[in-house]
């Protein structure tokens, strides 16, 4: 049986639950290899099964490593589970309330994070796919001819997305951020129909065989922008150097945040230091002051400190880190990119 399923069955046994219900698309994909396009109910038990939408049956049969059955109705699905003697059901915490109410009258139910804990630790194959996604994204970034084509932010974002697909990506792993000038102080700025200003901040990633990458680079122009860039780079580098198994995620956030505080910009670092990624662009754990998760080998987490000066500009620098005995940066794109 698949190791992921086997581990969850052990969790179920330890907690005296008989089955585990998943509906989140990437959770179903993680367990079975099949990513739903409509809806699906994955029930992990001794004989795991997926109830898939009729529109998805051809895809599900092709991709799934576990049994697939066409979904008929909640009543049919519940009756089949009850006939197997299932009386209690663990559910993923993200299960929609509208789905929960369909099951609550027939089963004892509790939310469990079994799948989240499984997905925290990447296999060598998963890390290889994240690495390939990163290589595609970084190669595409270097192929951009930003300053010579007089493009707008939206056009540069489009070109980067196109290059990633041409280089082997399925698509971008999130809405590509290309922002410049004062708008770069917005961490989630939306590319606009305007010619690029200084500085230029680009946050982008690719998907390869389902797995995401994530990088950010900021290209600066003025002396003040360079001063802020240097502070963020110091925070980025020292946070990565501090990462090792056994520490808490919050410890790394503190390292990054303390560097920025040393220069009196602590109020301008307005988000966490990093997040895990994999099949989803944002997974757990993350480098934040509130995350007490212990760092383990096999985790893949971004480091992305930033300083945002409202009305002036922002600087963010981001790399993805694979954790072994130490922190290994995935990819080889230089932190410093000179366009000006």
Map each language-model feature to its residues.
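Active-site neighborhoods and metal-handling regions in enzymes and metal-associated proteins
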Residues: 1-340
């Amino acid at each position: 049986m698949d190791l992921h399923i086997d581990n969850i069955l052990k969790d179920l046994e330890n907690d005296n639950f008989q089955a585990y219900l998943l509906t989140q698309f990437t959770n179903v994909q993680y367990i079975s290899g099949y990513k739903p396009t409509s809806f699906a109910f994955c029930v992990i038990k001794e004989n795991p099964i997926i109830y898939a939408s009729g529109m998805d049956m051809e895809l599900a049969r092709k991709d799934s490593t576990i049994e697939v059955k066409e979904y008929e109705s909640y009543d049919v699905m519940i009756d089949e589970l009850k006939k197997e003697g299932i009386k209690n059901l663990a559910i993923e915490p993200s299960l929609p309330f509208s789905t929960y109410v369909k099951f609550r009258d027939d089963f004892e139910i509790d939310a469990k994070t079994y799948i989240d804990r499984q997905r925290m630790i990447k296999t060598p194959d998963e890390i290889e796919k994240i690495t390939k996604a990163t290589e595609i994204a970084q190669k595409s970034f270097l192929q951009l001819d930003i300053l010579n084509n007089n493009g707008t932010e939206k056009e540069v974002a489009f070109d980067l997305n196109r290059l990633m697909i041409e280089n082997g990506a399925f698509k971008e792993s999130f809405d590509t951020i290309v922002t410049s000038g004062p708008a770069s102080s917005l961490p989630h700025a939306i590319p606009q129909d305007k010619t690029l200003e200084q500085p230029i901040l680009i946050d982008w990633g690719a998907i390869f065989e389902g797995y995401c990458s994530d990088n950010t680079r900021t290209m600066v122009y003025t002396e003040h922008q360079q001063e802020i860039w240097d502070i963020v780079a110091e925070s980025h580098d020292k946070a990565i150097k501090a990462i090792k198994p056994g520490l808490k995620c919050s410890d790394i956030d503190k390292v990054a945040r303390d560097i920025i505080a040393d220069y009196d910009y602590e109020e301008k670092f307005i988000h966490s230091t990093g997040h895990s990624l994999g099949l989803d662009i944002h997974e757990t754990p993350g480098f934040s002051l509130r995350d007490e998760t212990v760092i383990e080998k096999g985790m893949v987490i971004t480091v992305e400190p930033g300083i945002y000066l409202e009305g002036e500009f922002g600087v963010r620098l981001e790399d993805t880190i694979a954790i072994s005995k130490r922190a290994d940066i995935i990819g080889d794109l230089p932190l410093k990119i000179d366009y000006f």
